[in-house]
Each structure stands twice: as structure tokens, then as C-alpha cells.
Amino acid sequence: SMGQICFAFSPYSVDIAKGVIIGYTFGPKGWIKGAFPIPDVIYPRERAYSRSKLQMRKRLESLGVTLLNPTLVGKWETHKILMQNIRLRDFLPETKLVKNFSEIGRMLKNYNGVYLKPVAGSQGRNIVKVTKRRASGIYEFWYMSEDRMIKGSASNLTNLQRSLSRVMGNRSYIVQKQINLLKYEGNIIDVRVLVQKDNTGEWDVTGMACRVGS
């Protein structure tokens, strides 16, 4: 009714050289596949962490395309931004960027447990929980691998680092104070809230849901 074409597409279906995108638009009988021109506005629904996707975003922006969602800045930058808000900072668990494993040891002197989270991760992948037994000094850790819970222990930080190298790899990580998590029927849950600006430029809650862990 507005004389505009809306279509969905994968970032891998964009041909910049030809100025064509293979995508799908919704018609009276369902989804229709077709070739479309480079649009004026794109609302990205994917997480553009990979180098190829970031390059595609930059190329589209260089053509004058408006992308409504900026790329995610990562957990560490997000934490620093939230810490600048005096109304929020008291609600944030202590968080440090892991420059070396001694940072984890320092955190465990103050708290019963910590979480290690990849700076550029999502959907709970490669997150590690670490605790330290006060009496023995033994470190215990848990993480998910291919839908299976891996549990282990280490006698010192050097052995802990060696044990976690498989899951952590060369990724940048933050270490965060363990907090008490909400549970439903034994599963951890968290609440996701979608906030968008309305037609007047004011922020409005447009969606809310609970994510239940496995």
C-alpha cells in the first residue's frame, strides 16, 4: 500500500557487483523467491560477528544503504557502557576483562564462583563456571560441549588454564561474579526485553520473553 517492496534475504545471497539480492517476499499465496535490487534500508536480524558479515555490512553502507541495527559491541564494551549509568551500575555484577588467568584467581578470592564468558559470544556457547574450594584450593569447572555437560577440576591456575584451553581457545573473555539465577522446573531462565523507539522517538517495550536453559 506504500509502494515499497519488503523482502528477506541472507547476507550470503548478496551480489554487490551485479547489484542484485536473491531473497523472498511474502505474497497472497506465501513466500515468493526472487531477485531484488540493493535496498535503501536493511533491518539486520543476524549477529554480524564473523569477518565476512562485517565486510558485507561495510560494503552495503558504502553504497548508501541504511542499516537500522548497529553491530553488537560485545560483553565487555556493553558492561563499560552500562557502568556509566548511575542508575544501573549498582545492579551490575563485578566484571573484569581476562588479560591473564591470575584475574580469575583474584575474583575467586572474593566470590564463591565466577562465570567466564566470551566477549563476542551468544546463546550461552563456550561459557564456563568456575568455583574454588576454600579448604583445599581446588578449582572446579563446568561447561557445555555438544549438549553434554563437562565437569572437571584443577589443582592450580596453570592447570585450570590448560584444562579450559579447549573450550576457551584464543577468544577474548570476561570473568564475572556468579549471581543467583532464576530457575523454572530446575532449568535456568532469563528474561529478554525488546526495546525500540516509536514514531515519536521515545523508547518503548515492544516485546518480552523468558529463555529457558537446557
Task: Annotate each PLM feature.
Residues 70-74, 119, 152:
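Short, contiguous, pocket-lining structural segments
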Residues 1, 7-12, 55-60, 115-119, ...:
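Short N-terminal helix-initiation segments at or just after the protein's N-terminus
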Residues 28-31, 63-67, 89-91, 117-120, ...:
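Short, surface-exposed linear patches
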Residues 108-113, 120-128, 132-214:
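Phosphate-binding site of ATP-dependent enzymes
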Residues 33-41, 58-64, 118, 149-150, ...:
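Short, mixed-charge, low-aromatic patches
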Residues 7, 68, 115, 174-176:
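Structural detector of well-ordered beta-strand residues that form the stable sheet scaffold
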Residues 3-103:
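Conserved N-proximal alpha/beta basic substrate-recognition cap immediately N-terminal to
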